[in-house]
Amino acid sequence: MTVDNLSAVNYPLSTIHCQPSTAMQPVKLYPSVFERIDQWPIYKLSQDRRRFIEEIDEFTLNRLVNEHPKLYNLITETIYLERIRLKESPWKVDPPNEMQFWNRLRAKIVKTESETKQQALETHKELILRIIHRYSTEIVGTFSIATFRFARLFLYNFFNRLLNAAAERWWRFLSSRNRLHERIQVYGEVEMIRDLMKKGIVIVVPTHFSNIDSILVGFAMDQIVGLPSFSYGAGLNLYNSGAAAFFMNRLGAYRVDRRKKNAIYLETLKTMSMLSIVRGTNTLFFPGGTRSRNGMVETRLKMGLLGTAVEAQRVLCEQNLAKENKKISESTRPEPTKIYIVPLVMSYHFVLEAPFLIRQHLQITGKEKYIAGRSEGNSIREWLKFIWQFFAKKSDIILSFGKPMDVMGNFVDENGDSFDARNNPLHISDYFTTEGGVTQDLQREEEYTKLLAERIVDRFHRENIVLSSHIVAFTAFNMLRANNDTFDLYALLRLLPDDFIFPIESFTAAIEAVQHALFELEEKKRLKLSDIIRLPAAQLLEDGVKNLGVYHVRKPLLFNKKGDIESDDFNTLFYYHNRLENFGLTKRVRWENYKMEMRIGEFKPETEII
């Protein structure tokens, strides 16, 4: 049954604004969980950096030796790939002696062909260890209290200055933190997360839409939620900038070089992540691996770093078992240090890089079917303009913290105890126990990682907070598709936006139908709605169009002089529409009931690059 059939019974159009509220309120401003920065796990790890690197080197070497019977092939393949990397994509941040290093290793590996089997094995181990150590010293960052305090003060004053300058009212200076809190709104299980910080290790896994995500998440967790700094990955290319390199080198970031695809580097990176978690370091990483190119909430996650959380939990279980000197009854046995996974969903009215990201996505998926049009700039000037306008205009940014889980995807309570779907208590160590002991089984842990990824994806969708801009973009693009149902996606995107009008009455009626569907999904706890979604459709439509892609030169949607809706850019409209894909909304509305108008009698797909 479609929404159109249900609306008259369940959600009368005249009372749609009276839908019960979920009573979501932004969290208050919290003090720091740990008053002293030298108590932070990331600082303690940095203080023991040399020993930490030694642990990485030793662990990675042992694993590679055990998993790769032919070390010669492993080394030669690594040298080959690294030499290609240096020739085809050199970066300013690369060490000046990089090519010399790999040339020397190539000369040494050739000499092993004349050595005895045992001599060659020892030489191979030595060479692999040298490679690992070069990688580990590059990857592992540091954390400086002085630099952190400077960065915190700088960001606070920077945002404060923008707020006052943009508002042109200096008397608001004293309330700037509260006004920033109004712009960056935080919802969810914050109290529980703060409690769990003192009981175990917290790993925050956010959705990823924009390059500004890292700054906003870090700022919100520090200034609003009061959490200590997390370890996080930063692309090595960012270190090409001297200023960026200075700060990231000293703020707990570990460096990730996405050019390096060889097995030794990837194993070293995963080992670093796993051992840092075992040492108690709270970590943040984007499980999707990169920004969402199509604008959808992630449905597929990268298993590499996510798997290190599962492995780290097993290692912690092993350590806990080793500390026990006698057998303890099942009812009284102590739990090991727990790892808690916290999904975090970012919700924006805008993504500065949206035109660039969707163009990349369409070029990859459409290939010859997709013809690129004009693009907006993504320069430093555009970024500065974006930051300025963000503070000059009220455009919400939402951070929704999900309910914490253990590494198996089971929910935990405020004490950190795990429970299954029937609310039965669980011991996390049971998942890693075979014949009475905690055992390593990498294949089993791969399956656990897949289960965890599925749970995170599910929570990403359930914790997603729908904004007014999401609903108007979703509605508009589905109207466009229904009114041009003979075209495939790429032909649809080649249509000239100037030829189409979304009549205000038809658009408003379609918005009402989508509202009905969203209320049903909210009732089933499939997603969350911002309070503005409960307003009458006309008000919701006005707010959504006003906020949608507010910083883009070519607007996804805008009002024309007659009060109807038009679009400057179907590609970007498609991007923002995708935010509500994968929720089953499309099939709940009879889109053919909502007609569009054309300015000309006949229109054809655009065939020239514009």
Could you say what each language-model-derived stretch is?
Residues 2-7, 13-284, 289-610:
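Membrane-interfacial terminal anchoring regions of lipid-handling membrane enzymes
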